[in-house]
Protein backbone atom coordinates (compact mmCIF):
# COMPACT_ATOMS: atom_id res chain seq x y z
CA UNK A 1 0.00 0.00 0.00
CA UNK A 2 1.29 3.47 -0.86
CA UNK A 3 1.41 6.55 1.36
CA UNK A 4 -1.38 8.98 0.52
CA UNK A 5 -3.50 6.33 -1.20
CA UNK A 6 -6.93 5.16 -0.12
CA UNK A 7 -7.94 1.51 -0.39
CA UNK A 8 -11.46 0.14 -0.08
CA UNK A 9 -11.93 -3.54 0.70
CA UNK A 10 -15.41 -4.67 -0.33
CA UNK A 11 -16.73 -7.06 2.30
CA UNK A 12 -20.24 -7.46 0.92
CA UNK A 13 -19.75 -11.00 -0.42
CA UNK A 14 -21.31 -13.70 1.79
CA UNK A 15 -17.88 -15.34 2.20
CA UNK A 16 -16.94 -12.35 4.40
CA UNK A 17 -19.71 -13.05 6.94
CA UNK A 18 -18.16 -13.39 10.38
CA UNK A 19 -14.78 -12.08 9.21
CA UNK A 20 -14.43 -8.36 10.00
CA UNK A 21 -11.24 -7.02 8.39
CA UNK A 22 -9.09 -4.96 10.74
CA UNK A 23 -5.54 -3.61 10.85
CA UNK A 24 -2.85 -3.63 13.54
CA UNK A 25 0.85 -2.88 13.96
CA UNK A 26 1.16 -6.35 15.52
CA UNK A 27 1.05 -9.63 13.61
CA UNK A 28 -2.32 -11.32 14.26
CA UNK A 29 -3.66 -8.05 15.69
CA UNK A 30 -5.58 -8.24 18.95
CA UNK A 31 -5.08 -12.03 18.98
CA UNK A 32 -1.30 -11.45 19.04
CA UNK A 33 -1.39 -9.05 21.97
CA UNK A 34 -1.65 -5.93 19.82
CA UNK A 35 -4.36 -3.38 19.35
CA UNK A 36 -6.52 -2.37 16.42
CA UNK A 37 -4.98 0.33 14.21
CA UNK A 38 -7.68 2.90 13.46
CA UNK A 39 -5.81 5.88 11.97
CA UNK A 40 -7.42 6.60 8.60
CA UNK A 41 -9.61 3.48 8.83
CA UNK A 42 -13.36 3.51 8.22
CA UNK A 43 -15.67 0.51 8.40
CA UNK A 44 -19.23 0.34 7.12
CA UNK A 45 -21.93 -2.28 7.57
CA UNK A 46 -21.67 -5.91 8.55
CA UNK A 47 -19.29 -8.17 6.60
CA UNK A 48 -21.29 -10.43 4.31
CA UNK A 49 -24.04 -7.83 3.84
CA UNK A 50 -24.63 -5.41 0.97
CA UNK A 51 -22.55 -2.24 1.24
CA UNK A 52 -20.07 -3.58 3.79
CA UNK A 53 -16.50 -2.37 3.43
CA UNK A 54 -13.31 -1.48 5.24
CA UNK A 55 -11.46 1.57 3.93
CA UNK A 56 -7.99 2.79 4.85
CA UNK A 57 -6.13 5.93 3.85
CA UNK A 58 -2.41 5.34 4.33
CA UNK A 59 -0.84 8.42 5.91
CA UNK A 60 2.78 9.48 5.47
CA UNK A 61 4.82 7.65 8.08
CA UNK A 62 2.34 4.82 8.58
CA UNK A 63 4.12 1.91 10.29
CA UNK A 64 4.14 -1.63 8.97
CA UNK A 65 0.57 -2.88 9.20
CA UNK A 66 -0.97 -6.30 9.47
CA UNK A 67 -4.49 -7.19 8.38
CA UNK A 68 -6.48 -9.69 10.40
CA UNK A 69 -9.95 -11.02 11.16
CA UNK A 70 -11.04 -9.55 14.48
CA UNK A 71 -12.94 -12.73 15.35
CA UNK A 72 -10.63 -15.55 14.23
CA UNK A 73 -6.96 -15.85 15.16
CA UNK A 74 -4.56 -16.76 12.36
CA UNK A 75 -6.58 -15.18 9.54
CA UNK A 76 -4.35 -12.40 8.26
CA UNK A 77 -0.91 -11.34 7.18
CA UNK A 78 1.37 -8.40 6.52
CA UNK A 79 0.12 -5.50 4.43
CA UNK A 80 2.90 -4.00 2.35
CA UNK A 81 3.04 -0.47 3.73
CA UNK A 82 6.00 1.90 3.29
Which residues make up each language-model segment?
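GGW-centered surface loops in extracellular recognition modules
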Residues: 1-5, 81
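Short edge beta-strand/loop segments characteristic of extracellular beta-sandwich folds
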Residues: 8-12
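Low-complexity, compositionally biased segments
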Residues: 13, 31-34, 47
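Extracellular/periplasmic metallocenter environments
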Residues: 15-18, 39-82
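Short, surface-exposed beta-strand/strand-loop-strand elements in extracellular ectodomains
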Residues: 18-30, 81
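Acidic Ser/Thr/Pro-rich low-complexity disordered segments
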Residues: 26-40
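A generic structural micro-environment signature
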Residues: 7, 27-29, 62-64
Amino acid sequence: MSEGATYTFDQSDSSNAGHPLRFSTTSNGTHGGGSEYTTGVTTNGTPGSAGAYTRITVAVGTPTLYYYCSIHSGMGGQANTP
